[in-house]
Design a protein with these regions (language model features):
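Domain-level signature for soluble enzymes in the chorismate/prephenate branch of the shikimate pathway
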Residues: 1-356
Length: 356
């Protein structure tokens, strides 16, 4: 046996031991999950994870291997959380639309082992998470070309019981999908979500193709496929074309080549760890109040990555504001910032904590 064979044999022997230890570890995870279920505890415990990772690193004598072992332990904890969620019946995530929608693609990237549950509208996604029908909801929040999804931000404002616990940036390639064999000259009408239409505006104007908005891109593709009409086309992903038996006639028709949609993950469980946090607040209608808020944020040393305003529902000419800040939400400075903003703002609440 040469050196390579000996090394491989050693790896196989260690893997056999790891398999037995993995089963032993997952049995302990099951006990933890059952305890959490009995006591109504959340799956994710950020403080516990941090302690486990530090203890894991300390066990490795070879300093060069410590970061790799921490990654290994983090992966094991991620698997454990997925298993706990499944055991607790929380391994369900909601999205708007049908299979193949960009939200469905984002959900699959975020929760590869979860049951994806489809709802017709964003409102119903929020309601599903709020009721506990699903553990999470995945909805679009903003696009690098078409801007923010205002309706989703309004839903965040109207659901104070929900938290944003993660974000996911999905590169978007909008494609012109048609029935097999269709030529561009045959097309008379295009269907897609309003955001996809806006992202493809230059192409549509160039070929003078009128567009009709639909609830999402995958539903538009399904509609075109079921219509059997070669004069109709959809704007959607290449994955959607494969799902519904369509062809990509023209790829990447979006105006912005670097087209990205940010999705947010909703949960009833309050997040604790991250390097970004977002706030929603309202102000008295007095001169300089918004400037005062910005000064407070600056005085505490936080970088403000985003600020948006939206009309308050049922209150004419009054607004609420959204800000995203860079920093540790668990730091003492953050608690002090929120206390001061509580005096400066009419209302203020923490919306999300996540890592970017």
């Amino acid at each position: 046996m040469d050196a390579l064979d000996k090394a491989r044999a050693e790896i196989d022997a260690v893997d056999a031991q790891l398999a037995a230890l993995f089963e032993r570890r997952m049995a302990a995870v099951l006990s933890v999950a059952q305890y959490k279920q009995a006591h109504g505890l959340p799956v994710y415990d950020a403080a516990r994870e941090a302690v486990v990772l530090e203890k894991a690193a300390a066990r490795i004598q070879n300093a060069a291997l410590r970061p790799y072992y921490k990654d290994h332990v983090q992966n094991m904890m991620d698997v454990a959380k997925q298993y706990e969620a499944e055991v607790l019946g929380r391994n369900r995530a909601a999205y708007q639309g049908v299979e193949g929608a960009f939200a469905h693609i984002a959900l699959r990237a975020l929760f590869p082992h979860a049951e994806a549950v489809s709802y017709p509208t964003w409102d119903e996604v929020f309601d599903a998470v709020s009721r506990g029908d699903t553990a999470h909801g995945v909805v679009p929040f903003e696009n690098s070309h078409a801007g923010d999804v205002s309706a989703v931000l309004d839903l965040c404002y109207n659901h104070p019981e929900l938290w944003v616990v993660d974000v996911y940036d999905l590169p978007i390639s909008q494609n012109l999908l048609v029935l097999p064999g269709t030529q561009l000259a045959q097309l008379k009408h295009v269907y897609s979500h309003q955001q996809a239409i806006a992202q493809s505006e230059t192409f549509l104007k160039q070929f003078r193709l009128p567009a009709t908005a639909m609830p999402n891109t995958a539903m538009a593709a399904k509609f075109v496929a079921e219509s059997g009409d070669p004069s109709k086309a959809a704007i959607a992903s290449a994955e959607t074309a494969a799902l519904y038996g369509l062809e990509v006639l023209v790829p990447s028709i979006n105006t912005d080549g670097d087209n990205t949609t940010r999705f947010i993950v909703l949960s009833r469980e309050k997040p604790t760890a991250g390097n970004r946090f977002s706030l929603l607040f309202t102000l008295d209608n007095k001169p300089g109040k918004l400037a005062e808020v910005i000064q407070v944020i600056g005085r505490f040393g936080y970088d403000m990555e985003s600020i948006k305003s939206r009309p308050l529902p049922h209150v004419p000419f009054d607004y609420y504001f959204y800000v995203e800040l860079v920093g540790d939400p668990s730091a003492d400075e953050t608690a002090a910032l929120l206390r001061e903003l509580d005096h400066t703002c009419r209302t203020v609440r923490l919306l999300g904590v996540y890592t970017k």
